[in-house]
């Protein structure tokens, strides 16, 4: 699996990403996108439009990485996740353009991401050791 392309300034986080197993990378990406969306909401309330937009752009990049990490041969779950990520990207894009309902849209996306993160964490904790490539493919991750 390719490493996330999100810029990382923090040395600890950079090391964590470089040494993470594929399942851990997914969790790191979920944590990052949730953080970016929460920061966007705070900055929206503070009327810092530029910071709001930057955090939404970062969140979109992470969600696109999550899409790219899917093994589309693992049907139907990979296709369903792809569609869900696509929906999230549209909602974030709408929030960037339509100020009226952006708070509700972003909160809905955050809840979905939190649910997905919880699910992936459960999978990580119950999945067999990640040495076998076939095991990873079954978990919808591409190498």
Task: Show where each model-derived region lies.
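Membrane-helix boundary connector in multi-pass membrane proteins
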Residues: 94-104
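Acidic/His metal-coordination segments adjacent to aromatic residues that form catalytic metal sites
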Residues: 68-72, 97-98
